[in-house]
Each structure stands twice: as C-alpha cells, then as structure tokens.
Amino acid sequence: MSHSGDELNELEARQDPRLLRALDAVAPGTPLREGIDNIVHARSGGLILIADVEDVSFLFSGGIKLDIDYSPALLYQVAKMDGAIVLSADASKIAWANVQLMPDPTILSMETGTRHRTAERVSKQTKSIVIAISQRRDV
C-alpha cells in the first residue's frame, strides 16, 4: 500500500512529539529500557519521571538528591526505594530518588492504583514523560 505525499505529511503532522520522544527513550536496546527491564524482572515496580528538574521540583516532597550519571544498574538499585525516581530531561542523570510526587489531585484520572494515578496526573500537569512500572505479585 502506497501513500501519497499529502497523506504522509498528514500522518507526520498528527504525531505527538512527546509520545515519539517517550517511545524513542524506552525502545529496546536503549539504556533506559535496560534499566526498566531490570525493574520489571525484579517485580519491584517503580515510578520514573523524565524532566527538567527545575520545571517539576514544585511537585517534590522529600527525596534524596543524587545528580549522578545514569546507568541501568543504578536505576535498578534506586528503584528499590519506595518513592519516584527523577531523571534529567535527556535521561543521562539520575537527579533524585525516593521522591514523593504531589500532583494536583483535581486532575482527572481513571487509574485506580496510586502509582499509576500519580504518573498520569504528573504527566498531564507537567507534560513530562512519566513511566509507571507495576509491582508484580504471585496471587
């Protein structure tokens, strides 16, 4: 099936740059995906915010400022703490760990889990990439 130039231009115009950036960041083979996969395999869950820290710090309550170079192993280690992990906008640094994110509670969310509801609200409020990784249980 071939597309005309106009159809391709229309498809490109409808693409959400934020979604494309998120997909690019978590694509298989990327360091971020490796770190996420480690958390998934450990079944521990996590909440990762990728943003310019200065733009989202108003949401922080507590936490530990790290400002260290990103590695999949370090992401996995800090995910063992209960709070959110904040990565720099380009995901090259682990800026903060064990952060409680406090988004606007009036932002509508259909999510039922606390982690996923927080992720949705933070993303809507800040237009940042937020990744919620479910904790797995053998039930």
List each model region and its residues.
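Divalent-cation
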Residues: 2-139
